[in-house]
Amino acid sequence: TDHTFLWTEPRSVVGFWFALEDATLDNGCLWALPGGHRRKPARRFRRAPGGGTTMEVLGDEPPAGDAEAGFVPLEVRSGTLIVLDGLLPHYSLANRSQRRRAAYTLHAIDPTAHYPSDNWLQRNDLPLRGFRDRR
């Protein structure tokens, strides 16, 4: 889930996936678990004390990413926007076709949410700030 990597308190991350080309089963479309956003966070990727990163297990592991676990393909046409709740389990498979599957991905978090200092995605010399902090 995106919340695993972009942790905020309270949870606020939303993913935006813009299909720049058709995304199909052949070229590696996204797959998602219907209702999976209602689950509690299972993991958190964070900076480890002393350097490096670690995956902290918080609860039950999310189901494996396959159709047998209930994941469904999100085949879409070029120009489609898929909005992903931060807790929604999703993935894509390898593109096994000769066609590209270009997409643009953007994540947004609430600028009033707390972004912990041990989140892996940040630079101490360039702190993450919300738009409201700009002067």
List each language-model region with its residue ranges.
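Sterically constrained small-residue positions within well-ordered secondary structures
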Residues: 7, 65-67, 97
